[in-house]
Regions:
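Basic, flexible Lys/Arg- and Gly-enriched helix-loop patches that mediate nucleic-acid binding at interfaces
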Residues: 1-247
Length: 247
């Protein structure tokens, strides 16, 4: 923990337990103690001599920020536990893997890149729309896509009151009955691509996230998890902070 004072929710996030937003919720739910006293506001500054507990358990010591790239297979969810007992990507982690959270999410049927980190502040940085990171997806649909279809998808439609901004969409390949598309979005709203294509009666057969900002799926095998080298992670975080307005 750093010597200078910082907001308590930020310190909780840095410990890898959850995001800053979730830390603030825990505080408002009166599940957080500071120096053995329950608190109810996140507007508190703490330093490295303070003791922070969640549900009466002391938070872990802040570790060096790390992140991993995971190729999520279809059929897995991205939360750590599930009332329906569906498989989660956390079951893919080795037993001695550090405590991590996901950056963003993918629905159960979507494959591809999901980023894991032990730092909730990094997760916040990469998730926020203000950061402006592009997400690129490879999508197979049950249709021979026409130029008119592309025009409609690029129109950034409003579906059920939610506006979806499509940065780009291009045809990779197609047959008489199927098309592979590459779609780029920025905000990563819940089920964004599925909602956009469904709005235009285009059925998805496969949806694969290829990249998230500067981080690429590349040749990572399904179910495989690879740590981002420290020097690369440090450089990318520095560049992202330089060109974003997030504080």
């Amino acid at each position: 923990m750093l010597n200078e004072k910082q907001r308590i929710a930020k310190i909780i996030a840095r410990s890898g337990i959850c995001s800053r937003r979730d830390a603030e919720k825990l505080i408002l739910e009166k599940r957080v103690k500071l120096n053995h006293q329950t608190i109810n506001t996140p507007a508190i500054q703490v330093n490295n001599t303070d003791i922070i507990e969640i549900d009466n358990i002391k938070i872990p010591t802040i570790q060096k920020t790390k992140a991993w790239l995971c190729h999520k297979p279809g059929g897995y969810i991205t939360t750590s536990n599930d009332p329906q007992n569906r498989r989660t990507i956390f079951e893919l982690l080795p037993r001695d893997f550090p405590r991590v959270i996901t950056i963003g999410r993918l629905d159960i049927n979507t494959e591809g890149l999901i980023i894991l980190t032990n730092d909730g502040e990094l997760a916040r940085l990469l998730e926020l729309p203000k950061t402006g990171l592009l997400r690129v997806y490879k999508v197979r649909v049950y249709k021979r896509i026409t130029d008119n279809d592309l025009k409609k998808i690029r129109s950034s439609p409003t579906v059920d009151g939610v506006r979806y901004n499509v940065e780009s969409v291009d045809i990779i390949s197609q047959t008489n009955s199927n098309t592979w598309l590459e779609i780029t979005i920025k905000e990563g709203k819940n089920r964004e691509i599925r909602n956009i294509l469904s709005y235009f009666d285009i059925r998805i057969n496969r949806l694969i996230r290829k990249s998230y900002g500067p981080f690429q799926l590349g040749n990572i095998h399904k179910g495989e998890i690879i740590e981002i080298p420290a020097h690369i992670l440090k450089k990318q975080i520095s560049l992202i902070k330089k060109y974003s307005t997030v504080t």
